[in-house]
Amino acid sequence: MVKLVLVNPQIPPNTGNIARTCAATGTELHLVGPLGFELGDRYLKRAGLDYWPYVDLHYHNSCEEFITHWRGQGGNLLGFSVTGTVNFWDYTYQSTDWLMMGSETDGLPQMMRDLSTQLLCIPMPHSEVRSLNLASSAAIALFEAGRQLRSLG
């Protein structure tokens, strides 16, 4: 299954919700610091409910630390951004892909955008809407990748 990477997430309930989605889908969750909260934050724990024991959680102190880990594992690093040039529906996912999303306020740091194998976007037909909620985006991306990978085999 693909892996999910959150770079500098800021809002504990979003990350908790994403952790619950990762538990439900069997997806590794990689958090890249600095975070906008402590891992013991009560809102983070509450959003993840009692599913935390089922979350395959990995914490990296910095982008550089994560990059070293990712390079050791291999696979495509897929950045998600409102300015992405490839529609996420049109991308053919592989089980070794890493789906990477940035913070709720700043998106992906430029160095992570530059490192991405592809920069994907989730289309939004209403230009007045700047972005989707991070937890919603993560769920949309994970379930599309999962749908494609199940249909392949």
Swiss-Prot record:
Keyword Cytoplasm annotated: yes
SUPFAM superfamilies: alpha/beta knot
Assigned keywords, A-Z: Cytoplasm, Methyltransferase, S-adenosyl-L-methionine, Transferase, tRNA processing
InterPro entries per UniProt: Alpha/beta_knot_MTases, SpoU_MeTrfase, TrmL, tRNA_m1G_MTases_N
EC code(s) of this entry: 2.1.1.207
Annotated residues for binding of S-adenosyl-L-methionine: 102, 122, 131
The organism's place on the tree of life at top rank: Bacteria
Reaction(s) catalysed (UniProt annotation): cytidine(34) in tRNA + S-adenosyl-L-methionine = 2'-O-methylcytidine(34) in tRNA + S-adenosyl-L-homocysteine + H(+); 5-carboxymethylaminomethyluridine(34) in tRNA(Leu) + S-adenosyl-L-methionine = 5-carboxymethylaminomethyl-2'-O-methyluridine(34) in tRNA(Leu) + S-adenosyl-L-homocysteine + H(+)
Subcellular location: Cytoplasm
Any one GO CC term of the record: cytoplasm
Name of a matching Pfam family: SpoU_methylase
Keyword S-adenosyl-L-methionine: yes
Recorded GO MF terms: RNA binding; tRNA (5-carboxymethylaminomethyluridine(34)-2'-O)-methyltransferase activity; tRNA (cytidine(34)-2'-O)-methyltransferase activity
Main location, first listed in the record: cytoplasm
Main enzyme class: transferase
Family the entry assigns: Belongs to the class IV-like SAM-binding methyltransferase superfamily. RNA methyltransferase TrmH family. TrmL subfamily.
Purpose of the protein: Could methylate the ribose at the nucleotide 34 wobble position in tRNA.
Record NCBIfam families: tRNA_yibK_trmL (TIGR00185)
Protein name (database record): Putative tRNA (cytidine(34)-2'-O)-methyltransferase
